[in-house]
């Protein structure tokens, strides 16, 4: 929603700033968003989310969480928060 809002407000003409979001983190966020846009069965999403978190390195979990927060992706923020060890 944050990116959509910036685009609608013509604030994205020169790019959208993503401070402290590396390409590696952005790719993970995009992967998550693509799956959640396409998939409709909640049970399948829960399985996919579990695998997504299982393969995520603990060292980048906080970075994904911060990106989800900055980009206002509440479901990803909730998922990463619930997987903090």
UniProtKB/Swiss-Prot annotation:
Keywords: Nucleus, Ubl conjugation pathway. GO terms for cellular component: nucleus; SCF ubiquitin ligase complex. It is found in: Nucleus. It comes from the Eukaryota. Its main location: nucleus. The keyword rRNA-binding does not apply. Pathway: Protein modification; protein ubiquitination. Coiled coil: none annotated. The keyword Transmembrane does not apply. InterPro entries: SKP1, SKP1-like, SKP1-like_dim_sf, SKP1/BTB/POZ_sf, Skp1_comp_POZ. GO terms for biological process: auxin-activated signaling pathway; jasmonic acid mediated signaling pathway; protein ubiquitination; response to auxin; response to jasmonic acid; ubiquitin-dependent protein catabolic process. Signal peptide: none annotated. Residues 65-85 are annotated as: Interaction with the F-box domain of F-box proteins. Belongs to the SKP1 family. May be the product of a pseudogene. Part of a SCF (SKP1-cullin-F-box) protein ligase complex. This is SKP1-like protein 6. It comes from Arabidopsis thaliana.
């Amino acid at each position: 929603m944050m990116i959509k809002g910036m685009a609608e407000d013509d604030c994205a003409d020169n790019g959208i700033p993503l401070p402290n979001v590396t390409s590696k983190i952005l790719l993970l966020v995009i992967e998550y968003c693509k799956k959640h846009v396409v998939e409709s069965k909640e049970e399948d999403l829960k399985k996919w989310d579990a695998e997504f978190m299982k393969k995520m390195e603990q060292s980048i979990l906080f970075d994904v969480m911060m990106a989800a927060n900055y980009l206002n992706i509440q479901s990803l923020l909730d998922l990463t928060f619930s997987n903090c060890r």
